[in-house]
Design a protein with these regions (language model features):
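A conserved ligand/cofactor-binding region detector
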Residues: 1-197
Length: 197
């Protein structure tokens, strides 16, 4: 995490350009084992777990796969972020923090039953909520155009609002000290729930 913060600070101080990669999906896979591989620590951790009498595979299988898509484009986006991080290029991946990811399925009496994948039920230790970067997003409503002596003024009226809250996730490239950032946006209601209405 220190190298992640240092690299972000270095990019800001140097004023270098940053690449923004937007995708509706990012199939990153399980972060723990991927990060160990990329840092060259996988075998050392496997051996340390074994020496402590712990089943490394069983423990790594406990991590929920981030439910951030379900197709080839999501895997491609993840590979791009990983590669750009490995190349030590400053990159920010931008996507949606889906509350429920890919569906789970089971077969009951010969019929496929789909269930939601509540991948965030135990939280996500890899993400950092960034409420100070939250923004209002307006949708629906009407657009009113007004011509004034200063030109065209556009006003958005009677819109609905949600609060977009970002969560940052470090993407550690292969044997690098410059992690990329995956910023996932979560939507929250601006209004509190009124139990009395």
């Amino acid at each position: 995490m220190i190298s992640w913060a240092d690299s972000r600070k270095r990019v800001q101080e140097q004023g270098v350009k940053k690449l923004y990669y937007m995708s509706a999906e990012f199939l990153m896979g399980r972060a723990f084992s991927n990060n160990l591989i990329n840092q060259g620590l996988y075998e050392a951790y496997r051996e340390a777990f074994w020496e402590m009498g712990l089943d490394f595979d069983k423990i790594t299988d406990e991590e929920n796969d981030a439910g951030l898509g379900n197709g080839g484009l999501g895997r491609l986006a993840a590979c791009f972020l990983d590669s750009l991080s490995t190349m030590e290029l400053p990159v920010l991946g931008c996507g949606i923090r889906y509350e429920y990811g890919m569906f789970r399925q089971k077969i009951v009496d010969g019929t496929q039953i789909e269930m939601e994948d509540d991948w965030l039920r135990d939280g996500n230790v890899w993400e950092i909520e960034r409420p100070e970067l939250s923004v209002e997003v307006h949708f629906n409503g009407t657009i009113q155009e007004n011509w004034t002596e200063n030109g065209l003024k556009i006003e958005h009226k009677d819109y609905n609002t949600v609060i977009a809250v970002p969560y940052d996730v470090p993407i550690i490239g292969y044997k690098t000290k410059t992690p990329a950032t995956l910023r996932l946006w979560s939507a929250r209601s601006k209004r509190r729930f009124d139990f009395h209405s």
